[in-house]
Amino acid sequence: MQLQTSYSNIRGVCHNPDPAKSPEQVELELSCAERLQINSVRFWLQQEKWEADPNGYFDLVEDFIHRCYAHGISSMPIFWNGNPIAEFKEPTEDDWKRMEEFAAAAIERFGDDPAILMWDVMNEPYCNDYIRKCPDPALVPERMENLKRMVRRMCDIVRRLDPDGVLTVGHEFIWHNESTVDLVDVISFHDYLKTRAEIEAVYQQAEELSAKTGKPLLNTETGCIGRSNPYDVELEICQQHQVGWYLFDLVAEGFWGDIHGIIYPDGTIRDPAIIAAMFGFFRKRTGGRILPNPNKEGYAYQAIKAVEDVLSVEETALFLSKVKTSDDILEAAERCVNILEANELVPMWDLPSARIEEWRAQPEAERDLHAIKQFAYDMAKRLKEHCLIL
């Protein structure tokens, strides 16, 4: 572990060791991270799990750290987390003793491991219900001071146990760094702000604090599709300011899966725009954009006609007609779907082509033929409307 003058090279994600995942699943996810040129992970240590099973828990963490490192990925473990604090009770000396024993054990086990980039002493000390649901705004400064006193002592513990280690605190807002900046080596802030102007202002404040203190910067959490903080916008501004970043988080799953995550557990991706942004390619938001013309060569006519033909009754003799299989209908529907998706005329989070693949994976006898016909009809109708076809 060695302090760097700049961490602008960091392309990180938040990604936790999970005892419920098989080694094969862990490897799949880390292989995807390596392909995305991720070079660091930030994850939460859990004191309670260590206290329950010291060796077993740290074996899990060590295995995760070394698997990451084998893929060229460093680790930033977080000792403690401020988010669950709903009520503040001054830690007793026994509490502090337990915290110190936990930190000492982690530092002894992992402190000299080349896989460790730095220690994050505490995640978001002031982002919790103790502050956010304070019944009287006049009490907020006192509550902030209580938490400040606690996190500073935590910093002192880690520094005393690892004098040469690299320390940061993952603050929710850049201005929260004023409470610990004298105790850490790296300025760390999180950014879930809602507009480009707000994000730019934060980076300017961060750069000013970095220049004032002579300490490098890191954005250790960012990106959320539910907070007006899209990954591609955030990454564009990160890259413009040459600040290293950690996206929250690698895998779309669990509690946060509906608004966070860049890949699914099977290695498929949520949004190609996120992946493109990670490599410096961004949507065009200036003049000169070209409106797609899905029917320029008449292929929309052909796709719609294919659906009309497959849904029509084709008489072969009196009272008889040619049977159209579900495969025939899906094949015709796919022509409309491919045009709709390629021109981004349908919601890309719920791809119609995914429904086609789900039906094709079913045995013919188990498919809902009426639902497939309705789907094909809807896709052709939608393409007609977009192409202004009567």
What does each model-found stretch correspond to?
Residues 2-184, 222, 234, 241-245, ...:
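Active-site mouth of glycoside hydrolases
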Residues 11, 213-218:
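Short, surface-exposed connector motifs at secondary-structure boundaries
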Residues 191-196, 250-251:
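Short, acidic/turn-prone active-site loops that include or flank metal/cofactor-
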Residues 195-205:
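Substrate-binding surface in catalytic domains of secreted glycosidases
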Residues 216-302:
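Substrate-binding cleft of secreted/luminal carbohydrate-active enzymes
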Residues 300-310:
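Disulfide-bonded cysteine-rich modules in secreted/extracellular proteins
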Residues 309-372, 377-390:
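Long, low-complexity or tandemly repetitive, helically biased scaffold regions used
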